Amino acid sequence: MTTLKLDTLSDRIKAHKNALVHIVKPPVCTERAQHYTEMYQQHLDKPIPVRRALALAHHLANRTIWIKHDELIIGNQASEVRAAPIFPEYTVSWIEKEIDDLADRPGAGFAVSEENKRVLHEVCPWWRGQTVQDRCYGMFTDEQKGLLATGIIKAEGNMTSGDAHLAVNFPLLLEKGLDGLREEVAERRSRINLTVLEDLHGEQFLKAIDIVLVAVSEHIERFAALAREMAATETRESRRDELLAMAENCDLIAHQPPQTFWQALQLCYFIQLILQIESNGHSVSFGRMDQYLYPYYRRDVELNQTLDREHAIEMLHSCWLKLLEVNKIRSGSHSKASAGSPLYQNVTIGGQNLVDGQPMDAVNPLSYAILESCGRLRSTQPNLSVRYHAGMSNDFLDACVQVIRCGFGMPAFNNDEIVIPEFIKLGIEPQDAYDYAAIGCIETAVGGKWGYRCTGMSFINFARVMLAALEGGHDATSGKVFLPQEKALSAGNFNNFDEVMDAWDTQIRYYTRKSIEIEYVVDTMLEENVHDILCSALVDDCIERAKSIKQGGAKYDWVSGLQVGIANLGNSLAAVKKLVFEQGAIGQQQLAAALADDFDGLTHEQLRQRLINGAPKYGNDDDTVDTLLARAYQTYIDELKQYHNPRYGRGPVGGNYYAGTSSISANVPFGAQTMATPDGRKAHTPLAEGASPASGTDHLGPTAVIGSVGKLPTAAILGGVLLNQKLNPATLENESDKQKLMILLRTFFEVHKGWHIQYNIVSRETLLDAKKHPDQYRDLVVRVAGYSAFFTALSPDAQDDIIARTEHML
């Protein structure tokens, strides 16, 4: 078996990482807000695609750039290290309200200088009434506004933070280079017919792409000039040589395809960076990096031996730390659902390739190098995912487990055995299906061929919908009734449990439809107002169709719906079925009163204990609750299938919705807005995250958990089925324990057809001490949901949620 070298970092990488993890309150950068406002004001007469292209070009030409001491990969998102830019075209309302209090946020604070406050107070008023969020609310119906106000459906993220959730076509970029892409655009423009309406709009889009590609080239040339300027005054010969080499790299990749591993990695990082300057969206991912960078790695490291493996890993480390520098500021409410300020920049390794019609294991030496580099660095970025398949070698799986034992929540695993065949059933070409990658958290898409947002824009609070179904449509939190029904526990008029399920079906269909209506509005406003030009240029077939991603330019386009509180739904329904209708141990009105009182008083607390201990719980491989949950979830899936997204019929294959369970950390704020539930959960406490069991309810070990998760209708949940498991570090101390985990992984993916799994390897005692002494644990990384975060950067509520999760032994 290959033994990875997981305890080695170069001095420069150690210093760089240490400096980054000790930035507790990152600054805010206002340069982008200033530059975009200037160009929007100057070019109001221009079509929006051209206006946005000019704004990006102006910003890239005039923003502050820097090269840090000893870094090997260069490029910065903002004027200061880890500073978060402001994107006023999406929203200014929360910025104006919260700007003075950003430093006081628990776990996600930002430092704002008085000068930056002055700039924002100057810039923001111009945007009032014309941001994406403003225009969404101008289109929402009163009913939709009411639903959003209650929080049963939440869709703030994309109105205020943009789109994304995709990987662009990095292989095409490396093959053609930036000048080659410009040639492709020029050829397409030569076929434009300006007497055709679609082409008239297409010409403006293609013109915008050309403006942006020129701007990107010139921006890279700025770094070449800066590197030469720094080399001229550098006293250390070795660093001077590095700076000159970086200048030469930038000179080449500013126009031509890269020739070396260093150049290829640098070009990919520049594009990754500028994509996140262009758009405020997150989960901008790299796709299958071990595949498209391997030819360069093989030539330099294995064949020509012009680069040794250790130096290649150091370059990867430098790239990963540059990803950690990228930052994002969200509204106070949205930051609670994205605890730890994650960017979800996913790198996928492993899996299979389709070669002459036959699946072949895709693991190569770069797969091992990327895995090892992440295991050594133990950072939150990139979000490393491994594509599992039945033919994966024990050697590579063993290497993955070695990294899992490092305790930073990576790698996560996605399962080829279910993703690929289900993608092919959707209509995705087999060659493309075998080329899928993890996007953001657990979502999957085909890099460079899939439209924005493989994850949806609106979360549905399943627990609150369930409570409404039990109480005649009445939302216990807001007091509102959106869809009235006759039956209610408080009236004691449910005749049997089938009527409870009928009520659930009715309510979830209603809320699902409303979530899609809201998605439509947000999608439409993003399409009309924030064309992301560079991103579209790097997704097939946007150039050929002369359409942005949002207009239907991508080859494929599916969007997943999202929900929070899946396990709470199953556990609550199981408790009502068994204790109220089968045993008659609890009366309908008795349960309703206990829920309304949040189980206050001795009698209600005794009833709560019966709900907790006397009814089956999801996560223990118990069919009575697992199949009930699957049945309830299926109604949501069936309703979702009825709808098309706004790109349907406009070019892409697909244009539909499917389910997904990536709840990020929304289970904490959603729980805070949810009253007591029949599973015994108290009001305002966290809901279950993803498709994982509710904290403290999975008593029979990790094998029972995967048995329960495997009964979900996974094949229809193509947005991903998120499973977090927390293991005590003592569990993986010896070789036999490692073998047990490998067997567990193979069983989950091959027998139970699981979609995804990831592990926290950290003790409760360590987490409690880190909460008490944060300065001693600034580099402690934990798995939150489909992403990892620095534990001390989380809010106290999010920290408590992770501490409360069940800790398993193998």
UniProtKB/Swiss-Prot annotation:
A Pfam family that the UniProt record links to this protein: Gly_radical
Keyword Nucleus: no
Record EC number: 4.2.1.-
Domain annotation PFL: ranges: 11-682
Domain Glycine radical: 689-810
Function per UniProt: Probably shows dehydratase activity.
Other observations noted: Contains a dehydratase motif that is predictive of enzyme function.
Stated name of the protein: Probable dehydratase YbiW
Species for this entry: Escherichia coli (strain K12)
